[in-house]
Amino acid sequence: EFTTLFLLFSVLLLSASAEQCGSQAGGALCASGLCCSKFGWCGNTNDYCGPGNCQSQCPGGSPGDLGGVISNSMFDQMLNHRNDNACQGKGNFYSYNAFISAAGSFPGFGTTGDITARKREIAAFFAQTSHETTGGWASAPDGPYAWGYCFLREQGSPGDYCTPSNQWPCAPGRKYFGRGPIQISHNYNYGPCGRAIGVDLLNNPDLVATDSIISFKSAIWFWMTPQSPKPSCHDVITGRWQPSGTDQAANRVPGFGVITNIINGGLECGHGSDSRVQDRIGFYRRYCGILGVSPGDNLDCGNQRSFGNGLLVDTV
């Protein structure tokens, strides 16, 4: 009996003292913006956050540490109405921890270039995805650009978005309308996205709207993946994309505007001012302000010819 009690006490002691974060805890993150120490514990003093003591979510970040570009508090400030009662995402579906976890599957996302490039990429990513999921309006509390990440699924009465394909066959009864931060749509996007992230999205497309990490992964996959003749959004915002002669003739130049062209240029670009483009820019400027970085040049696409039909459905 004594041996049994001793073993039980030992188990309880070990479980109570188990590490909280980082490599010692399967990559878990600290809550409330705390730093993860090199030993796997959460805190906010020098023992946790200081140079040589911090392994993740460190002040100022480190190469490869997305937490140094966007903190939990910044995330909440940017998407401060995502849990409004009128939003599908209420209940913290779009959480900071889910975003950080998903981003870890895409080396280079938010970690490429100097701190200016990294901040611009995060601002641009959240601006474009906020436009796709916005629940805001002109006179909304805190302004129209505080309502990103409100919706999980395409609004209205969307169709099945099934294009006959041998490579990406539609599953019986499944619909491939817009879901998640980037509102990924069509079987020919769900198929390769699912293959890339290791999930069968052709048979289970609604995972993009029910699993937070998969939802973020779908958006980051689109962001990081070039689809010829389009470059990836990532390569554009980090300065890796160099316009070809064809691009230059079409006025497609590096900047936030060409990312809008990649996403929905067939509908929004090449015809002067467009309210949807301005909405994207409004989000981008706000997020750049929160992250403390200038937005750069060439923000709109009014004089750019489109790459072709957009791969996504515009939900606004």
From Swiss-Prot:
The source's superkingdom equals Eukaryota
Domain Chitin-binding type-1 intervals: 19-60
Q: Which GO terms describe its molecular function?
A: chitin binding; chitinase activity; endochitinase activity
Inducing or repressing factors = In response to infection, elicitor, ethylene, wounding.
Catalytic residue list: 132
The listed locations are: Vacuole
Q: Where is the signal peptide?
A: 1-18
Show the catalytic activity: Random endo-hydrolysis of N-acetyl-beta-D-glucosaminide (1->4)-beta-linkages in chitin and chitodextrins
Report the EC number(s), separated by commas if there are several: 3.2.1.14
The record places propeptide residues at 310-316
Pfam families per the UniProt record, alphabetical: Chitin_bind_1, Glyco_hydro_19
Q: Does the keyword Disulfide bond apply?
A: yes
Provide a GO biological process annotation. Answer: chitin catabolic process
Supply the alphabetized keyword list.
Carbohydrate metabolism, Chitin degradation, Chitin-binding, Disulfide bond, Glycosidase, Hydrolase, Plant defense, Polysaccharide degradation, Signal, Vacuole
For this record, the Gene Ontology CC terms, alphabetical, are: vacuole
Q: Which cysteines are joined by disulfide bonds?
A: 21-36, 30-42, 35-49, 54-58, 87-150, 162-170, 269-301
Family under the similarity heading? Belongs to the glycosyl hydrolase 19 family. Chitinase class I subfamily.
Q: Could you tell me what this protein does?
A: Defense against chitin-containing fungal pathogens.
The identity of this protein, by name, is Endochitinase 2
What is the scientific name of the source organism? Solanum tuberosum
Taxonomic classification, please?
Answer: Eukaryota, Viridiplantae, Streptophyta, Embryophyta, Tracheophyta
